[in-house]
Amino acid sequence: MRIAVVSAPRHRGIPEYIKSLAKGMEAMGHRVDILDAWTEDGMRLPGYEYIAVCAESVSFWGGKIPDILGKVLGAGSGLVGKKSAAFIKKTGPLFITKALWNVMKAMEKEGMKVNWSEIILNPAHAEALGKRIGA
């Protein structure tokens, strides 16, 4: 399966847990591309069979996600009905489920079907989650 992992961390760059998530998916025989939300425009997203969105909360208390995520998903026309997964990196003790809900809300706004959501604890956990995609 051809999978896009959209990385929307708090700061620019690809964090280790996203690389581990992609590594787990590749171990299951999938073709995986990591798209950085800070540098990509989202136009390539319709070409993938499955889209995994990984984000981090930008605030410690509020569950707010990076604004760039909505822009990237909005630019990728043709996402209606696309199977997808939502992941959020656990960054604090509170409101992490609200941040995950906000990621899923942004995805569903574009018509994507979110069939899996999870909170990532660390890179090893992310790799284990990646091995469950398509299984």
Stretches with model-predicted labels:
Residues 6, 13-135:
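FMN-binding flavodoxin-like domain, especially the glycine-rich phosphate-binding loop
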Residues 1-4:
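Extreme N-terminal starter segment of soluble prokaryotic enzymes
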